[in-house]
């Protein structure tokens, strides 16, 4: 197979693949064949060379199988570069892909084969005792290495196969020559793994040991010293840990101190005695130390303090312990003697004179408080208790007058009555004492006489309302509510005429109802003439047609409630009592919202069963018929007057 090839001209100004022209001059490229016969003969020669190399590698692998002794080498021992057997090949490296670079590949591979062969010969000389090398100097050098470094001569069979790429097994001869005769005499087989070393020189025994005549008669033959022969090198290692005892003691002391800080102090008797002894010793040493440095402190003080400052900053402490002269001046408390009037005047004059001479600087810190603080006794003033009581009583009376003259501010509830609230619950808000009376707790005192300044004009109830109190089902079934005011006095039993005397002293009560058209205002003023028509209208609304729709329902909201005037505060003129007439005395008001049949039936249970206004029954019916308004429920009675 002949291939034609035409050479391309290459510029000599360029470098070929990083190689300079000097390299090309030293290693010229091979000449191209003129004809095809020369080229074919070269290909045939390369093929024959490859076949010979392959046959040699087969023989070496067969011998390695027979011997069983394997060693490591690389694949480069078999030059498998038959792929590059012509100048048309591209080579192994991708960098040398030019058609002219095949010569450089040949040179590199030839050099690498030579170096690899030299390394293999060195390994065989050192480890396998082979002498097949042709280099005399290399053989002598390897013998010298083997003599100086015996640990390199380790013979044996490799058990673990190599895992690295590029390595293979090859056979070694069964009998390997050894350089020394002593080694050959003891060597039986090379398949065993052992380490060769130098023989130890044994010491000869002394004359007393070898001569049996010198031995004592009582000794046996077993007591003779014997030397055990052994081969190998003996090395002795002496390890000594040098620790300083002082450092160790110091470490223990520091660790003890740390442990003592972390935990509670010891409370054992031994520790307590130890601490007490240490405290006493410290006190003695401290006293001696203070006594030694006392003179130095005084000299230092005298040297730095001026004469002016000595008079001002004079230390005059009184020592509580005269037998102990080693107390520091700063620890001794100064005692101030009692001062008289003459001494006080002298001190004030001296202080005024010395204020201009007080130094400003570090010496001011040494000032003491002697002659600067004056303490005098002040006689106690006895208080007049009778005068204070009178003042308190007068203040209380004034506050009561203010409360009584106020137009019903403490009696009227703040908000509107809630729906679905019973009649007793709606009127119970009037029985609560005012906030000011609940907060303060006045001491018990006697009743004050009625004076002209406290009296008020008395207005009888005949001018306002004439009638009899009507009972309700709640009055018959339930007990009267308890009064929340503490100091209200109960009225005497059987007094019916006294009710009209103090009735004009109470405040006016105004109860606002929900809705603008269903309001009921009941007020008591000194002008009874202006309120008579309004009261007559209230009385007329009571005898209207009964409401039978919500008569027996307990949850019916009461749109109107009592507007009552309490009449209990008989023992205290000038003090308005808060509450409803729960004792059944006098007239407190008339219900505007209850018009049921049960309420009308309650009139028969009164002992005085006459109606106060009998001639106004017919106009009442007419007025109630005109005043009734029809809403959704059809059961709410509203007043036709816009002002109510």
From Swiss-Prot:
Residue stretches of biased makeup (Polar residues): 449-459, 626-644
Compositionally biased region (Basic and acidic residues): 395-404
Region (Disordered): 392-490, 551-575, 609-644
Pfam families documented for this protein: DUF3719
Superkingdom of the source species: Eukaryota
PANTHER family the UniProt entry points to: AGAP003710-PA (PTHR31997), PRIMARY CILIUM ASSEMBLY PROTEIN FAM149B1 (PTHR31997:SF0)
Similarity section: Belongs to the FAM149 family.
Name under which the protein is recorded: Protein FAM149B1
Biological classification of the source: Eukaryota, Metazoa, Chordata, Craniata, Vertebrata
